Amino acid sequence: MSGHSKWANIKNRKAKVDEKRGRLFTKIGREIIIAARMGGGDPEGNMRLKAAIAKAKAANMPNENIQRAIMRGTGELEGAAYEEMTYEGYGPGGVAMLLNIATDNRNRTASEIRYIFSRGGGNLGESGCVAWMFNPKGVITVEVPAGDKREEVILQAIEAGAEDVDDEDDEVLEIKTAPGDLEAVREALEASGVTITHAEVEMVPQTTVTIDDPETAGKVMRLIERLEDHDDVQAVYTNADIPAAIMDQLDI
């Protein structure tokens, strides 16, 4: 087991904010559409779709919305043809940023994302400029208070194939897996009765850049927020590590 996940603090801080913005269902809907288009509409035979549906249900997305998104993906209903892309760039303090994009107009999206980067003190980079700094990993977060049950859950995760368990938080475990092992580990944890709050493949930085200046940290967070506010941005990953003490000083 390694040390604390450097991106976890930022993700946890922003989770409640994202829920309030009203864009969550739109983003998850696009995720379902793309997954169904690529692998078919049966979640039992399409692990990416299964994970997207689980994410939708965790966000309390109505079942009819989920089904419509699946049907748009399979072509049973008409809808926009979304294209997946990856954008790379740099934020304030030179931190690396990697964006998952789902767009029906790549020229519009590129122009708008470039403007957001520029306005936020960063710049949109060339393909390959920062992607090498990240690795795909299954990331699962579960609510497990300290105690005997916690140790049991850690052992279950490792036995099911987890590569790493971050247990520094007193209430939450963050578990990392190889992308192909995510579903098996998630199912093993569900069988143990714990509450899973997040489970999907993410781009995890190999190393991090500590931002211990509040002004720079604030600029990084504001840029992340503006990027996540864009409808075409499905996810934002960064190698920024903003310590909890600095995060507490930010008015974000």
From Swiss-Prot:
Cystine connections: none
Keywords: Cytoplasm, DNA-binding, Transcription, Transcription regulation
InterPro entries, per the entry: Integrase-like_N, TACO1_YebC-like_2nd/3rd_dom, TACO1_YebC_N, Transcrip_reg_TACO1-like, Transcrip_reg_TACO1-like_dom3, YebC-like
GO biological process: regulation of DNA-templated transcription
Compartments it resides in: Cytoplasm
Single GO molecular function: DNA binding
An annotated GO cellular component: cytosol
Pfam family, one: TACO1_YebC_N
Similarity section: Belongs to the TACO1 family.
HAMAP family linked to this entry: Transcrip_reg_TACO1 (MF_00693)
Protein name: Probable transcriptional regulatory protein Moth_1704
